Amino acid sequence: MIPRAHITAWRSRTPWSNDAQIEQDLVICRALVEIFSNGLAAREVAFRGGTALHKLYFDTPGRYSEDIDLVQVNAGPIGPVMKAIRARLDPWLGTPQWRQSTGRVTFYYRFESEMKPVTPMRLKVEIATREHFTVLGFKHIVFSVDSPWFRGSADVLTYAPEELLGTKLRALYQRRKGRDLFDLAMALQRLPGLDRLKVVDCFNQYLDRDGRQISRAEFEANLARKLKDAVFTSDVPPLLALGISFNATEAHQCVQEELLRRLAGEPWKQPDNMPKRG
């Protein structure tokens, strides 16, 4: 899909060592510009998730991603939004497989890498269709791509970093992916002026919308269990950029000190027979 020379040229702009990841990165960058260059899509969806954090708020991304996570910002039929996004992506990515489930629509675009060894690749574009709100207000950030293969820029609708991290904290509790811990720790270290209390407030407000409450002890116990799980801790290393390392214990300590201790309730009491980390 992308001429090899253009993939090689993009290498100087990315921190990835793997040719397939470099190609994927360029595909994601173009897809973002394409989506937010469509007038309807630019008004109706906002960009969030780990890819948003690394692409919009970090000088250089810390980890690789193959997904674009979007949120439908206004209540209404999702059909026109789906049509608008496909109008920008299908002409160069082909016809996607797609799935609609409760609260989300997901497109899967599949292709093969140009560089050898030929690798099956995909771009997943997911739209959350029920969270039509923002805690801290939306932000517009100009995102640009300058490649011989594609040049363009778009005004991307997204969230304040504290709100992105509030939803990332929710993801850390709800799913078993070490990348959520990595993203939180990296943001706490890299983003000066980040308001920790606002991150926690956003986390709590999203939980309120879900009709849930999570105490400090519940969260700490949940994370302690995950840190003993090899699936959780092995999730990150294959995704890391050149020169970036991940120490789960240090990341845990950072997130604990900066965020979890600010949650409501008493701290979790670790059982005497449970080995301590670090």
Predicted regions and their residues:
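Structured mid-to-C-terminal alpha-helical surface segments
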Residues: 1-45, 56-64, 68, 72-278
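Glycine-rich beta-strand-to-loop/alpha-helix junction loops that act as flexible
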Residues: 47-52
